[in-house]
């Protein structure tokens, strides 16, 4: 619970209310003994839906999240990128207004991470889910964000705010443009990093 201020979604306070924010840690934390359909439908079960209702609702999003054909598989049978997609779907089903993502792509190799970034941007544009994205990767922050908030050390306070004024969906080569490098430099300067 916040010690001061308020948290608003659509102009209404959501402090102490569940179902608005889905949270995803760095690791996918899929349950290894449950099939993918049962892993992603878990938030719906916890919200009171029957197993059948939860599976049906979760299953209706599999194509959108690029998970076709994985419903009956176990997490160990999927690649890292596919497990992250399943975890993101579970997060989306847990909170339908805001997703809080804590470095969801940090464990992925460069090629998979790049593919996931492009996929993530297209899906978030489609489902219109607001996202608070935590990352230590400056390129990732510039590529995925509308706004970058830079925090101080503990206790964390916002020290800088940088608006990324590039339209979405972002151009495929955005990270190779002078504009991208300018945003990246702004972040580096705000962090006080000397290169």
State each model region's role:
Residues 2-17, 57:
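Conserved ABC transporter NBD signature motif
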Residues 34-41:
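Short coil-to-helix segment of the ABC ATPase nucleotide-binding domain corresponding to the Q-loop/switch region
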Residues 45, 52-70:
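Conserved ABC ATPase "signature" region
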Residues 74-78, 82:
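Conserved ABC ATPase signature
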Residues 93-97:
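A short, proline-enriched helix->beta-strand linker immediately N-terminal to the Walker B motif
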Residues 99-102:
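Catalytic Walker B motif of ABC-type/P-loop ATPase nucleotide-binding domains
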Residues 128-134:
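Conserved H-loop
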């Amino acid at each position: 619970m916040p010690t001061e201020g308020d948290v608003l979604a659509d102009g209404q306070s959501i402090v102490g209310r569940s179902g608005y924010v889905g949270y995803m840690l760095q690791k996918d934390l899929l349950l290894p003994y449950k099939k993918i359909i049962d892993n992603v439908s878990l938030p719906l079960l916890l919200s009171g839906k029957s197993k059948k209702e939860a599976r049906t609702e979760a299953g209706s999003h599999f194509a959108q999240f690029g998970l076709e054909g994985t419903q009956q598989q176990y997490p160990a049978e999927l690649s890292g990128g596919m497990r992250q997609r399943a975890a993101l779907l579970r997060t989306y089903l847990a909170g339908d207004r805001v997703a809080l993502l804590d470095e969801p792509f940090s464990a992925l190799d460069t090629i998979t991470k790049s593919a996931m970034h492009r996929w993530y941007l297209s899906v978030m544009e489609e489902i219109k889910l607001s996202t608070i994205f935590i990352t230590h990767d400056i390129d990732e922050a510039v590529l995925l964000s509308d706004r970058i908030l830079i925090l101080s050390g503990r206790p964390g306070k916002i020290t800088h705010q940088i608006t990324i004024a590039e339209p979405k969906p972002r151009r495929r080569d955005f990270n190779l443009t002078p504009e991208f490098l300018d945003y990246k430099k702004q972040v580096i300067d705000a962090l006080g990093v000397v290169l």
